A protein has these predicted regions:
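N-terminal anchoring/stem segment of glycosyltransferases
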Residues: 1-66, 79-82, 208-211
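A structural signal for well-ordered alpha-helical segments within the folded catalytic domains
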Residues: 19-22, 68, 72, 157-165
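Short, hydrophobic beta-strand segments that form beta-sheet elements in well-ordered domains
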Residues: 34-43, 87, 112-113, 181, ...
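Short, polar loop motifs at secondary-structure junctions
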Residues: 40-47, 97-99, 117, 184-186, ...
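Short loop/helix-cap segments at secondary-structure boundaries that form the rim of catalytic
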Residues: 46-53, 102-106, 198, 216-217
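GT-A fold catalytic core of metal-dependent nucleotide-sugar glycosyltransferases
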Residues: 57-59, 65-123, 136-137
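Glycine/small-residue-rich pyrophosphate-binding loop that anchors the diphosphate of NDP-sugar donors
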Residues: 126, 131-135
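Catalytic core and acceptor-binding pocket of nucleotide-sugar-dependent glycosyltransferases
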Residues: 134-218
Length: 219
């Protein structure tokens, strides 16, 4: 596969979450019409694959299940011809503003992620959490390869938890491997509950079942 742009956005889903994809795409087209979107197929239905036939679709054929395929999808996309930077977006992320400038914030050998303040407050036994709903990479970081391998070897709860456990509560290691991004690029549902949400976020992340209900109301 040969993509026309060096900076690409990437999302992905299977049959369980593909219902979010048309909603996600509509918002993406509204605020990022000139940007290239690649879609990772984690096991979508034939109907959905037909619906998105105008997009570049990458089948992720690996043993991981569901969201555990995310690091693998990022890894495979980063290796495509001409691609220099990749930004992963979960399908429950609502694009609410211009997002192309996020690529200006990438750092080599690091995962660009927003600090998950609600999770850090609620479950901080291993220090700061970083939310994996939006992940920015430049090139193919070694930490991404390790994360993808760990999601296959030790799939614990979710891909974000796997990365958190890999860091082992070592804040120095997090500084080495994680590039903190501004909260406007991943404002969480719980940020609103905790009254810490930024004004006019560019990406609103509707996490969990309550987030799903919010998305359904917008369909």
């Amino acid at each position: 596969m040969r993509l026309s742009m060096r900076e690409v956005f990437l999302t992905g889903c299977d049959t369980k979450t593909e219902w979010q994809l048309p909603w996600f795409i509509n918002n993406f087209k509204k605020f990022a019409p000139e940007q290239e979107l690649v879609i990772a197929d984690f096991g979508m239905s034939e109907e959905m694959l037909s619906h998105i036939s105008n997009f570049e679709v990458i089948p992720i054929i690996s043993a991981e299940k569901g969201w555990f395929k995310k690091p693998r999808a990022m890894l495979e996309t980063s290796l495509l011809y001409n691609v220099e930077k990749v930004c992963w977006l979960d399908t429950d992320c609502e694009i609410a503003g211009r997002i192309d400038h996020i690529f200006d914030l990438s750092e080599p050998q690091k995962l660009g992620m927003v600090k998950d303040r609600p999770w850090t407050r609620r479950r901080n036994d291993l220090g700061n959490w970083y939310n994996s709903g939006v992940v920015l990479i430049e090139g193919t970081p070694n930490i991404l390869k390790s994360w993808a391998n760990e999601c296959l070897a030790n799939p614990v709860i979710g891909d974000q938890e796997v990365l958190y456990l890999m860091m082992g509560g070592d804040e120095i290691k997090k500084l080495l491997f994680i590039n903190p991004l501004p909260h406007t690029y991943n404002t969480l549902r719980l940020d609103y509950i905790d009254n810490i949400a930024v004004e006019n976020p560019r990406i609103i992340h509707h996490t969990g079942e309550k987030g799903n209900n919010t998305i359904r109301k917008q369909l």
